[in-house]
């Protein structure tokens, strides 16, 4: 499972959400800050002929898009990464003003949900049907429709209308508005050496972060790109890395601007007064106290003070609770989610697989202070080459290459473990584990195809990733291929599992006996198995009303195909079996590792909430998210609890999280490495309505 990258036809809304990378020099020219580019009004011209594009991830060709123009425009878009990807067919009919008067989208999302979307203008009214249901609107409100499941070609559909508008801003259907900003002009070169002038743009209003793309000097789509993925005009594939690096730099500059506005650095010690401190050892809250921060350390935990000291900044905690910064243990780190995780009280990540160069750049930006984000602990991702492989980390074709990858990660010095993935040859795993352990690294991962969890336990895994990866071994035949969507759709078989059966008990007892961990990622399983078209996903109910309209729309979309009532029942019962399995694992002593594989932030709060359903108390959940994970990563001397001498990583909530864990969803203050952040400052920068007010600073 990896939701971390654009994984479905919803790509338009996710183009800038993933993260990272440094800005590549333009051809052989020296890299410079681009001058502001003025967006000029452009006439609406309908293209002719065929346009073709190549989809690429980290330099690898993974799919294509073809656009055929005639009386109508037909778009075919498909790519495959990690054994899955969207398949989209669109038919668009434009009026004389370039506005789609009919737009039909069909196909399947990355995880198999069927796409049957349509939009049509009839007279003075617009009618549309998407996963949320059917709606209509008067054309006086807006006449440009934002498709829910479109291909990246939708960027061009929107852009040419925005370019023709005076202020490059348009109200859109179903709600909201789009805004276009030109970024820079540059020249690219085709494989034949022909130069082409392009302009890059940022499109805002669809998602939390802008989408980045480029048009050529004729106004045609040239590319859409983020830090990992690029869809580029055929014949210009050599420009893919450059485009990705530009998208990364554009995003970095945006976040730099935001963090300059939201980061509070004080020139004297700061005391947070009148607070209770969560103690993960006693699983309780302290009496009312004050916590003093000097530079980036906790200097003292004292009694409440009655008046401000001229030598200190005093913040009124108003009787709220301080909790140590939390650990998102299944991240795929990206700059698009970094600041939002800080706002959610997540101050540490364990990255579970990434483009190694891109992640190095992100870590450098965070550690240098250029970007705000969690501390990142790295895992070395190793995948076997196959028609279904993921394109992260290092790809290998032989056991010797696999061992070489292990050694490379060990030599870097900052990877605490390796992560083995789906297409790895199971026969190579024992040697990889031996090498990793000899070099001081732990081993975690998926269960490779054509084997099972028992074999990986015997090979020496320290931790298994995703609860379905363990459970599939109890329901699949040996020749069934989990490199495909089968590893998700086969979860419909989980209701038949008998937790007390010998096979299940052997697996769980073996894990417990070896002191192994399970990173179950409950929230992603809930999302895959319980989300339904037209209904708000269960994990989003508590925050959806604060989100931008595009996110609210997305929240009412199924992730998997629910083709029949039997599918609905099977997935619901299968999810219940997942909870039963994780409860049994915990009861037997398997270490539970909390992570989302869904970007952390709001979903991380839901992940923690779900552990109450396996029998954990609220205090036990908070301890797991803080001190237990700091200990798991060998960082408990510095992080994981609020005590003098430790790093100042913690957050303030108005309520009592022991009485109600939902209190962690209303954070008023976050301190990370001695810098102070009010989520009420951060969220509006992403179009999110804050969940609570900032605390009062009593003296400055």
Residue ranges and their predicted role:
Residues 22-25:
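C-terminal motif of bacterial Sec signal peptides marking the signal peptidase cleavage site
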